[in-house]
C-alpha cells in the first residue's frame, strides 16, 4: 500500500484533510483492532505512509528481505496519521519509533524482523503462500479462544496488570460456554489432538 493519494490530499483544506483522516482511517483501524480474528499482513513491496500503519495494525506480518515499511510522512513535511505513531511506538518503543518516523527511510524486511515489526521473513515468492498456510493453521485452533486472546493483548497495551486480570477473567466466560473448550479438555484427558470447530 503506497499510502494516501497526495493529489487528493493536496486539494483539501487543513480542516477537510483532518476530517478525511478521522472519517476514513479511524473506522478502518477500529475494524482491524476489534475483529476477533487475527489479521495476517502479507507485505510484498513497500508499505508507505498510512499503508505502513495498516501493515502494523495487522496482528501478524509476513515480509521478504525486499519488503519494507516506510514512514514517509516526514518526507513531505507531515507527521504520522492513521494511528501510525501509536502502532509503531508500541512495537519498537518510543526512541526507535521516533527515529524511524523522523528518518523517512525504508525499513527493509530484515531490519523489520530484527525489530519485531514482522513475524516471518521469507523469500518474496513465498509471502502469500506462507501467509495462507499460517491462516489455515490458525483456523484449526479454537477461534473463540483466539478472539479472546487478541482482545486480551490489545486491552493490556493500555491497562495495568490488575485491570488486565479482571478483563481476562470476564473475557474467559465466553469460552466456558463453547464446544471447543469441552473438546479441548476431552482431547487433553484422552491424550489426543483436539478437533476444534469454532463453536
Labelled PLM ranges:
Residues 10-13, 92, 153:
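Hydrophobic aliphatic residues
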Residues 1-31, 47, 77, 160:
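Glycine- (often His-adjacent) and acidic-residue-rich active-site loop
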Amino acid at each position: 500500500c503506497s499510502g494516501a493519494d497526495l493529489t487528493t490530499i493536496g486539494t483539501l483544506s487543513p480542516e477537510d484533510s483532518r476530517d478525511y483522516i478521522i472519517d476514513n482511517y479511524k473506522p478502518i483501524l477500529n475494524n482491524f483492532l476489534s475483529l476477533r480474528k487475527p489479521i495476517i499482513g502479507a507485505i510484498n513491496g513497500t508499505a508507505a505512509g498510512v499503508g505502513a500503519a495498516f501493515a502494523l495494525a495487522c496482528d501478524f506480518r509476513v515480509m521478504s528481505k525486499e519488503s519494507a515499511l516506510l514512514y514517509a510522512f516526514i518526507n513531505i513535511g507531515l507527521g504520522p496519521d492513521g494511528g501510525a505513531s501509536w502502532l509503531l511506538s508500541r512495537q519498537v518503543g518510543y526512541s526507535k519509533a521516533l527515529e524511524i518516523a523522523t528518518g523517512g527511510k525504508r525499513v527493509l524486511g530484515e531490519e523489520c524482523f530484527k525489530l519485531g515489526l514482522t513475524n516471518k521473513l521469507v523469500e518474496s515468492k513465498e509471502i502469500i503462500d506462507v501467509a495462507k498456510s499460517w491462516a489455515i493453521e490458525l483456523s484449526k485452533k479454537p477461534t473463540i479462544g483466539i478472539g479472546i486472546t487478541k482482545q486480551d493483548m490489545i486491552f493490556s497495551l493500555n491497562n495495568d496488570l490488575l485491570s488486565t486480570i479482571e478483563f481476562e477473567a470476564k473475557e474467559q466466560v465466553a469460552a466456558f460456554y463453547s464446544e471447543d473448550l469441552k473438546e479441548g479438555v476431552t482431547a487433553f484427558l484422552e491424550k489426543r489432538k483436539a478437533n476444534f470447530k469454532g463453536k
